Amino acid sequence: MFDARMSFDKNRSAGYLVNHMARLFARELQARIVPLGLSTGTFPALLILWETEGLTQRELVAALDIEQATMANTLTRMERDGLIVRKADAADGRVQRIWLTPRARGLREPAVTAANTVNEAALGPLSTAERDAFIDMMTRIIAARGTGSGPGDKPESR
């Protein structure tokens, strides 16, 4: 027997639609940044580091609201790819701070341009007011559901 409480319409599910939209954005962004030698896995960390260099892994984890192990793997790949260097903190040699290489700094403009192009294309069907409302709603949901880090948040100053 069919139970209406168990029905699920993926086309009316915020979670399903957000996930689907995120995959579409990621696919389009990936196509634009791979030629730069970047990936969608490293792009969020670069966005933070382009704003504030010299962060610790822990600060990046908090800023991006991701798992420590995921961040460790991402930083290892970024170091391998010549995007970052890790240097001991001057005050506490046990702490490693993350710095961008000249190569990574030089990729900021083309990578951000690629992301803006993807955003503009994706949000093209919406009016300016709808875009603003959409971004505002997503930001509010993230703030209400997340850990407090998210869009617009910056790691604590050192």
Explain the meaning of each model-derived region.
Residues M1-K10, T128-R158:
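C-terminal regulatory/oligomerization modules of transcriptional regulators
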Residues T52-T56:
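Short capping segments at the starts of secondary-structure elements
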Residues E67-T70:
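Helix-turn-helix DNA-binding motif, specifically the short coil turn and the N-cap/start of the second
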Residues S13, L17, L24, E28, ...:
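Pre-recognition alpha-helix immediately N-terminal to the DNA-recognition helix
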Residues M1-L36, L100, P155-R158:
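N-terminal leader segment of winged-helix/HTH proteins
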Residues A22, L47-E51, V112, T139:
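Short, locally clustered residues in the helix-turn-helix/winged-helix DNA-binding domain
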Residues A26, T76-A143:
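Charged, amphipathic alpha-helical coiled-coil/dimerization segments
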Residues I48, A63, D81:
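Residues within the alpha-helical elements of helix-turn-helix
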